C-alpha cells in the first residue's frame, strides 16, 4: 500500500492528475486513460517491468485499484498499449508544465542548464523502415552490436529535468546541440542562460554561433585533453588559484574565450591508482606471454586481447613484434608516462564567462554529475530497458513514461534533501512498501462476507518519514460485502 500511496501523492504534487485530466478524457466506454497512465508511471517508479507483468500480476497485488477507485479492467493489455499511443503529442506541453511546478515547489531557477546524451539498446535486427530511430551507432553501453536510440536530456543543477529528446541511434554527439538550443529558445524565449556540457557535444562552429547570438549564449564546455598539448606552454606561466580545498585552477584568456585548467587532488589519486593497476596487470601479462610457446597468429590474438583490456595503459608500453618468428619485446615508454602523470586529475574547460570567478566556473562544471545521476537512475532504478515494444512510437512512449517516473523520483529526492539527505528515494520507497493493506473477512448469517480492508500499523521509521514529509495517510477504506459464492480478493495488496 505505502509505495503506491506515496507515488500517487508525488504524482498529485506535480499536478500531473490535473494536467492529464484536460488532455486524456475518458473514453465513451468509461476507460480512464489518465488513471491508466498514472498506474504505468507509478509502476515504473515502484517495481518496473513490462506492461504484460503489470496486466497479469502487479496491479492485482498492489493498491493502485483501491487508491484510484478502479478495478482490474483498468489494466487490460490492450488498454495499456492504447494509452501509450495517446501521450506523445503532449510532450512539449508537459515540459512547460513541469518547469512551472519545479519553480513553484522548490524555487528552481533555469539560469544554468546541464546538457548530455546517453543511449539505450535493443537486442533486435535493424528495422527495415528508414525513418525508424533504432540504428547502430556509438554505444555508451558497450553494445555496438545492437541497434539503439540516443536520448538527449536537459536538467538544472539541482537535477530537475526540463526537456528530453529521442534521437536516431546513429546521431553524432556534436550534431545535437544546435537543435536543442533552438527548441529551448522557441519554447521559453531568449534569456541569459549558461549551458554546461561535456566534451564532444558542441563543435567550434556551434560555439562561435553561441558567442555571436543576440544576446550571447553563455557556455562552459569540457575540452579534450589533446588541446592541452597546444596550450601547455602558455598555461605553465599562469599561477594556480585555489577555489576550494583540494581544487586548483589556472585561467588562460584567449581572443574570444577563457580556458580553465582545473586540478583535483582527489581525482589525481583516483586516476593514478587506476593507471597503476592497469599498467601493473599489462606488464605481468606481457611477461607471461613472452614465456609462452605460441604461433604467430595466437600471439597476435593474445596481444590484441591484452590491448583491449589494458586500454590507455597500452600506450605507455612500446612493443616490437618480430616479423619472422612468434616473439616480441617490450619496454616502458618513460617520456609518455611522465606526460600522462602531468595530466592526471586535470580538466581543461573553455567558456565565454569572463566575469565569473574561478570557483563559480568549477562549481558549474562539477554539476554535470546531476545529469549523470539522472541517466543512472533511468537505466538503474527505473529500468529503462529491456524495451519489448515493436514500433518506434511505442518505444518513445515507453521512454516518456520512464521520464515521468523520473520526475516523481526527483520530486521525492528534493523533498528528502532538507530533512534526510542521506536517504535515497529508492530506500524510502522500500520502507513504504512494507505498509500493507490487509483484508479481514467476516461471514454473515445471510451467507455473504463482510470485508474490512485495513492497512498495517506504521513502524517508527515509517512514522518519522510520514511526519517529516508532512504526509497524512488516507482514511481506512469502508467495508465491503460480497454476495454469496463470490470469490473475494485473497491476497493483501501492497499500498
Across the structure, where does each feature detected by a protein language model lie?
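Anion-binding and metal-coordination hotspots
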Residues: 1-6, 11-495
Amino acid at each position: 500500500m505505502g509505495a503506491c500511496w506515496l507515488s500517487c501523492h508525488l504524482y498529485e504534487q506535480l499536478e500531473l492528475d490535473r494536467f492529464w485530466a484536460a488532455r486524456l478524457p475518458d473514453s465513451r466506454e468509461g476507460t480512464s486513460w489518465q488513471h491508466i497512465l498514472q498506474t504505468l508511471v507509478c509502476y515504473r517508479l515502484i517495481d518496473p517491468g513490462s506492461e504484460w507483468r503489470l496486466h497479469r500480476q502487479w496491479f492485482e497485488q498492489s493498491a493502485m485499484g483501491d487508491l484510484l477507485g478502479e478495478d482490474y479492467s483498468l489494466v487490460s493489455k490492450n488498454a495499456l498499449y492504447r494509452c501509450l499511443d495517446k501521450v506523445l503529442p503532449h510532450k512539449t506541453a508537459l515540459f512547460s508544465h513541469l518547469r512551472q511546478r519545479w519553480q513553484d515547489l522548490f524555487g528552481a531557477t533555469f539560469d544554468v542548464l546541464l546538457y548530455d546524451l546517453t543511449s539505450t539498446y535493443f537486442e533486435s535486427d535493424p528495422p527495415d523502415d528508414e525513418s525508424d530511430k533504432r540504428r547502430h551507432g556509438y554505444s555508451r553501453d558497450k553494445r555496438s552490436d545492437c541497434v539503439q536510440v540516443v536520448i538527449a536530456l536537459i536538467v538544472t543543477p539541482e537535477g530537475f529535468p526540463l526537456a528530453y529528446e529521442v534521437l536516431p541511434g546513429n546521431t553524432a554527439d556534436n550534431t545535437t546541440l544546435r537543435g536543442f538550443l533552438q527548441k529551448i529558445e522557441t519554447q521559453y524565449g531568449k534569456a541569459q542562460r549558461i549551458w554546461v556540457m561535456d566534451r564532444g557535444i558542441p563543435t567550434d562552429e556551434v560555439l562561435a554561433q553561441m558567442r555571436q547570438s543576440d544576446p550571447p549564449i553563455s557556455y562552459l564546455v569540457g575540452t579534450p585533453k589533446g588541446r592541452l598539448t597546444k596550450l601547455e606552454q602558455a598555461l605553465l606561466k599562469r599561477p594556480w588559484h585555489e577555489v576550494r580545498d583540494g581544487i586548483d585552477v589556472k585561467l588562460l584568456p584567449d581572443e574570444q574565450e577563457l580556458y580553465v585548467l582545473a586540478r583535483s587532488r582527489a581525482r589525481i589519486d583516483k586516476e593514478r591508482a587506476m593507471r597503476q593497476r592497469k599498467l601493473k596487470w599489462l606488464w605481468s601479462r606481457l611477461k607471461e606471454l613472452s614465456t609462452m610457446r605460441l604461433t604467430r597468429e595466437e600471439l597476435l590474438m593474445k596481444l590484441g586481447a591484452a590491448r583491449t583490456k589494458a586500454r590507455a595503459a597500452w600506450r605507455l608500453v612500446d612493443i616490437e613484434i618480430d616479423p619472422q618468428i612468434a616473439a616480441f619485446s617490450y619496454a616502458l615508454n618513460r617520456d609518455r608516462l611522465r606526460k600522462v602523470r602531468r595530466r592526471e586529475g586535470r580538466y581543461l574547460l573553455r567558456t565565454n564567462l569572463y566575469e565569473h570567478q574561478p570557483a563559480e566556473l568549477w562549481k558549474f562544471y562539477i554539476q554535470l554529475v546531476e545529469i549523470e545521476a539522472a541517466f543512472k537512475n533511468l537505466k538503474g532504478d527505473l529500468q529503462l530497458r529491456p524495451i519489448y515494444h515493436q514500433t518506434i512510437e511505442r518505444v518513445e512512449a515507453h521512454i516518456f513514461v520512464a521520464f515521468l517516473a523520473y520526475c516523481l523520483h526527483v520530486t521525492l529526492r528534493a523533498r528528502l534533501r532538507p530533512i534526510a539527505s542521506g536517504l535515497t528515494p529508492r530506500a524510502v520507497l522500500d520502507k513504504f512498501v512494507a505498509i500493507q493493506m490487509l483484508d479481514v473477512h467476516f461471514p454473515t448469517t445471510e451467507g455473504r462476507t463482510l470485508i474490512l480492508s485495513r492497512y498495517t500499523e506504521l513502524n517508527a521509521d515509517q512514522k518519522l518519514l510520514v511526519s517529516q514529509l508532512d504526509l497524512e495517510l488516507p482514511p481506512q477504506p469502508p467495508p465491503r460485502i460480497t454476495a454469496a459464492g463470490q470469490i473475494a480478493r485473497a491476497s493483501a495488496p501492497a499500498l
